[in-house]
């Protein structure tokens, strides 16, 4: 009878222990802890790669911005550079055209020369003043030494001057009804005429009193 009448509390105690034991496998705390994923080394590498990729994109964007600015600056400078290039090209073409015209005119003129005129022209082309004599003359006048370029320039100018005087003297000789060779009187008259035309500067120094 005593066994049959066990108190409910004793049964309840055994039941409670069994419930607690059964509840251990399904403990929510243990389940939640196991369910949280832990960070691994692979995830850290992925984050570093993403950060590096973002930095690369920013750098490439900065480079593209700088390139755009440089292109804009060059586009602003291009019109002036193009204009200068076009002007230089036009001047070169114009000069080349003028040279071709001069050569053509000279060929026509030479083809119309008489034999005597052609001989005089050839002699004039081949003639030249001795550069050493020109250099000594310049140094005696200026009292200083001069470069070779100055000597060449003065030699060419002197040749042109003598050619103009001789040509004018031949015109004087023809006008006076005389025949060559040229005489001193022809040369003096040629120089006088060229001075009157203003083609020869006056060598006499004039003191200017009033300004």
UniProtKB/Swiss-Prot annotation:
Localization: Nucleus
Source organism superkingdom: Eukaryota
Compositional bias annotation for Acidic residues: 35-45, 53-62
Disordered: annotated segments: 1-81
GO MF annotation, one: nuclear vitamin D receptor binding
GO BP annotations, alphabetical order: mRNA transcription by RNA polymerase II; positive regulation by host of viral transcription; positive regulation of transcription initiation by RNA polymerase II; RNA polymerase II preinitiation complex assembly; transcription by RNA polymerase II; transcription initiation at RNA polymerase II promoter
Biased composition, class Basic and acidic residues, residue ranges: 1-14
Disulfide bonds listed in the record: none
GO cellular component, one term: transcription factor TFIID complex
InterPro entries in the cross-refs: Histone-fold (IPR009072), TAF11-like (IPR045127), TAFII28_dom (IPR006809)
Residues bearing the modification N-acetylmethionine: 1
Broad class of the protein's primary localization: nucleus
UniProt entry keywords in alphabetical sequence: Acetylation, Nucleus, Transcription, Transcription regulation
Binding partners and assembly: Component of the TFIID basal transcription factor complex, composed of TATA-box-binding protein TBP, and a number of TBP-associated factors (TAFs), including TAF1, TAF2, TAF3, TAF4, TAF5, TAF6, TAF7, TAF8, TAF9, TAF10, TAF11, TAF12 and TAF13. Interacts with TAF13 both in vitro and intracellularly; also interacts directly with TBP.
Family membership noted in the UniProt record: Belongs to the TAF11 family.
Domain-level remarks: TBP and TAFII18 bind to distinct domains of TAFII28.
Matches recorded under PANTHER family: TRANSCRIPTION INITIATION FACTOR TFIID SUBUNIT 11 (PTHR13218:SF16), TRANSCRIPTION INITIATION FACTOR TFIID SUBUNIT 11-RELATED (PTHR13218)
Function: The TFIID basal transcription factor complex plays a major role in the initiation of RNA polymerase II (Pol II)-dependent transcription. TFIID recognizes and binds promoters with or without a TATA box via its subunit TBP, a TATA-box-binding protein, and promotes assembly of the pre-initiation complex (PIC). The TFIID complex consists of TBP and TBP-associated factors (TAFs), including TAF1, TAF2, TAF3, TAF4, TAF5, TAF6, TAF7, TAF8, TAF9, TAF10, TAF11, TAF12 and TAF13.
Protein name according to UniProt: Transcription initiation factor TFIID subunit 11
Organism encoding this protein: Homo sapiens
């Amino acid at each position: 009878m005593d066994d049959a009448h066990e108190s409910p509390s004793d049964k309840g105690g055994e039941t409670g222990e069994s419930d607690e034991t059964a509840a251990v496998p399904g403990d929510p705390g243990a389940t939640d802890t196991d369910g949280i994923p832990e960070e691994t080394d692979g995830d850290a590498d992925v984050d570093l790669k993403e950060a590096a990729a973002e930095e690369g994109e920013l750098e490439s964007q900065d480079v593209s911005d700088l390139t755009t600015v440089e292109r804009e600056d060059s586009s602003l400078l291009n019109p002036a550079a193009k204009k200068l290039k076009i002007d230089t090209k036009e001047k070169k073409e114009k000069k080349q055209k003028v040279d071709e015209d001069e050569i053509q005119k000279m060929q026509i003129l030479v083809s119309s020369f008489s034999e005597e005129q052609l001989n005089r022209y050839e002699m004039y082309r081949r003639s030249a003043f001795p550069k050493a004599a020109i250099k000594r003359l310049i140094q005696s006048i200026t009292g200083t030494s001069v470069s070779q370029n100055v000597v060449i320039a003065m030699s060419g100018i002197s040749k042109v001057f003598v050619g103009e005087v001789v040509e004018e003297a031949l015109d004087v000789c023809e006008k006076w009804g005389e025949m060559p060779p040229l005489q001193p009187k022809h040369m003096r008259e040629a120089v006088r005429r060229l001075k009157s035309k203003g083609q020869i500067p006056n060598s006499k120094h004039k003191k200017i009193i009033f300004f």
